[in-house]
């Protein structure tokens, strides 16, 4: 998709909108639902911190898939412990194979 915008700063702002929307949803969860439900995350950093960092680092598409996998691992029979966002995207990850962005099992595998 090519944007017909002459202003380079405007182009950056428009391309950053999905990332900001994802991080905004996490902020809304942290300040509305999370205080009511309480702290129950089995990992460090918390799942919302993980999601915020993943979306900031990799964008809404890849970071969203990483966050989904982390949320599915954060359950009573799932993983626990220190589980940081990877520094780089996995080598086999492509936009049309989104499940390859995430670790579905294990911690920091």
Curated annotation (Swiss-Prot):
Hydrolase keyword on record: no
A GO CC term assigned to this protein in UniProt: plasma membrane
Coiled-coil regions listed in the entry: none
UniProt KW keywords: Cell inner membrane, Cell membrane, Membrane
Chief place of localization: membrane
Location in or out of the cell: Cell inner membrane
Bilayer topology: Peripheral membrane protein
UniProt key word Coiled coil: no
Pfam family, one: YidD
Function: Could be involved in insertion of integral membrane proteins into the membrane.
Similarity comment: Belongs to the UPF0161 family.
Protein name from the UniProt record: Putative membrane protein insertion efficiency factor
Source species: Rhodopseudomonas palustris (strain BisB18)
